[in-house]
Amino acid sequence: MYKRQIIHCDEFQTEGTDKIAERIKKRVGDNALYLSIDIDVLDPAFAPGTGTPEIAGMTTREIVNVLRGLSGLNLVSADVVEVSPAYDHAEVTSLAAATIVYELTNLFAKS
């Protein structure tokens, strides 16, 4: 059916968020898009409150910039997963997740 395309976090550094957003838009085209964001895509410095923190992840600025660059896609559904309040002592992860949900809501409004 659909082939997945993996974009590694280091590509955000080498290509920049604008080019990554364009790659995603080209790949998706006019198809309906379900976007699932696992919070552990963010570096633990930006999202420590997850069950599986991964070093060398994205920054919050990178994910916000990419989401803003996806305007015009046929976004039909989205979610943010793996936020674990038990590990989120300063609520940094919850704030990052809320910001992502805000940006996703803006995308829905523009779809």
Language model segments and positions:
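Short, small-residue-biased leader/transition segments that mark boundaries at the very start
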Residues: 1-2
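Catalytic cores of soluble, metal-dependent hydrolases
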Residues: 5-111
